Amino acid sequence: PGGSETILSKHLPSYAVVERNDILFLLDGDKNKKIKPVRISEIADADLVNTMCKYYGCELIINASGSNGKKNEQESNRLKRQVLEYAFNKVKYLPFDTPEQLLIEKAITPSEKEIIDSQTWSSNDPELYKNQIRLLAQHLYDKEEVNAEEIFCLQQMMTARLKNELPEFIKIRKIITQALDRGIIR
C-alpha cells in the first residue's frame, strides 16, 4: 500500500534486509527513469544516497545500529548497498505510465468516451487519467463528489472489461516470467 515513494523508501528496505525473495515491485511506468543500473561496487559510500535518489526519486531508508546518538557508518553503508542492489533486481515498471491511463485508453465504453469528450482536458495535467475516472464515477453514481471506494469500484468494473491478450498484459507476464526464470523471485 502507498505510492511508489512510500513503497520504495519504507517497504523495500525492510524486505531487502531480511532478503525476501518472493517479491517483485511493479511500479507505474511513469516512475521509470530509464537509467541503466551501475555496479554497486562502483558507487562510493558518499554517493549511495544520491544514487538512490537518482534512480528512484527518494532515499531508500535503512536503520543501522548505533550508540550515543551515532549510527554505525560501516553497517549503514553495507545496508545501503544491500538495499540498492535489491532494488536494482526487484524494481520493475509497468509498460504504460499509470493503471488509470490503461483503463481510459483500453476499457471505456462508447458512452463513457462521450462523457470524457464532453469536457476539456489538459494533456499536461499529471492527474489527467485519474480526473477522467473520477468524472466517470461521478456520472455512474450521479453524485457531485465520489469517494475512493466508489472510484475503486468503477476501476474494478473497467478492469473486468480488459482482454487477457492485451499487449500490455503480455508485457507484464513477460516481466514476471523473466523474474521467475532469472531467480529474481521464487
State where each predicted segment sits:
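Hydrophobic, Leu/Ile/Phe/Ala-enriched alpha-helical segments that form helix-helix packing faces
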Residues: 11-16, 79-83, 176, 180-183
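Generic hydrophobic secondary-structure signal
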Residues: 26-27, 54, 63-73, 103, ...
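Terminal low-complexity/disordered tails
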Residues: 116, 126-186
